[in-house]
């Protein structure tokens, strides 16, 4: 799709592959065929193992599912730290990218919920706060700020909890045109009772 008449897509793709190879060598990788085009399909080919954060993330989630106790928590912690947000944002309108992003986001959210519960029970409120702050930055409309406020309240950081409430309320009003929901309002009442 998107090719003008008379343009050979394979020739253009070969040019892109050639330029990529040159860029990889300039970046310090050994000179070899990194991308191979066979029957119109590109595949990665290198003499050394290559690991991506997305693959490593899904492996950690799978290993967590097969584990229990401290091992499970360790895999969830690693997975959570590997997750940095949307996969291939430049291609976010491609159907396969949308589907994969939804899968990865779901895995991430489940990991955050389970880790958050573990950290709360363990009394690791600072780490729990870091966890929810990251989740809230990645997905500001998924209500992670509620857990962030709860952590701040446990840490007796009432002013900071109020600031999170105020900033979240402003974000929801400006971006979505809706006021904060009942869960957020109940947090405001709890904050006000402590200030």
Residue ranges and their predicted role:
Residues 1-130, 134-143, 160, 173-175, ...:
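Intrinsically disordered, low-complexity protein-interaction/activation regions
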Residues 117, 150-154:
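Tandem amphipathic alpha-helical repeat scaffolds
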């Amino acid at each position: 799709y998107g090719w003008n008449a008379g343009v050979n897509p394979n020739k253009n793709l070969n040019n892109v592959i050639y330029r990529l190879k040159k860029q990889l060598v300039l970046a310090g990788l050994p000179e070899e065929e990194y991308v191979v085009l066979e029957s119109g399909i590109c595949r990665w080919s290198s003499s050394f193992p290559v690991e991506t954060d997305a693959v490593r993330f899904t492996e950690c989630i799978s290993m967590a599912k097969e584990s229990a106790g401290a091992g499970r928590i360790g895999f969830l912690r690693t997975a959570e730290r590997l997750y940095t947000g949307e996969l291939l944002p430049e291609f976010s309108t491609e159907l396969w990218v949308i589907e994969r992003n939804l899968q990865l986001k779901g895995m991430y959210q489940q990991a955050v919920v389970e880790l958050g519960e573990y950290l709360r029970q363990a009394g690791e409120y600072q780490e729990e706060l870091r966890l929810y702050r990251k989740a809230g930055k990645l997905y500001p409309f998924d209500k992670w700020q509620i857990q962030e406020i709860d952590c701040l309240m446990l840490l007796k950081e009432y002013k900071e909890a109020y600031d999170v409430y105020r900033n979240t309320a402003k974000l929801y009003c400006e971006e979505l045109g809706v006021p904060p929901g009942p869960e957020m309002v109940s947090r405001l009442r709890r904050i006000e009772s402590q200030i």
